[in-house]
Amino acid sequence: SHQGLLFVQYDQETDAKLLAFDLASGEPAWQVKRDVISWSSPILVDNKGRMELILTNSRAVDGYDPMTGKLLWHVECLGGEVASSAAYADGIVFVSSEEAGLSAIDIGGHDAQPKILWRWDDALPDAASPLAKDGYVILPTGFGVVSCLDAKTGKLRWEKEFDRGFWSSPVLAGDRVYLIDSHGGMQVFRLGDAFELLGAPGIGEAAYATPAIVGDRIYIRGL
């Protein structure tokens, strides 16, 4: 939500749209038509003082004005079924799909045209979204491989293979990444140039939802 508005990405085969609702009344504030499908959710970013709502879909990534629904920019770089939401850090948007790979897009300032900086076509997520922070991009896959890339260049920093796959997205607290696998095993590792496992607790049941961190607690939904 932003400035009293709740945003809903309603991408599907027919009657796709992006909607904004007034949080206080529940009334529609605006809506824009879309002609794409996806399984992803929007993210809200501060692009050099201008708030932008960023959506991924089966063909592209789009940036919208969250107050009006105006399309600000559009980059064709995706394909196939897209479940991963975008990630953002330091002026760069990271979007991925199994069919089209991961693209790092410099969205620049308010008048600049977005440009693709680099692509990654190796181990790619099925549903998990990338995590971007402090010059790193964490990319988990459904078959258990986790890659750490340099956010500026796309160079592989490290890669680690786990016994289980990941459908939920990684979350960050300080410099610690929390990533839960499909069988409920939590991998806790440090964000950095080398893989450093800090702990591996489990919840004892399958997990597909992304954990939420509030204060000093982490909330996990199992099956």
What are these language model-derived features?
Residues S1-L223:
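Noncatalytic, solvent-exposed loop/strand surfaces
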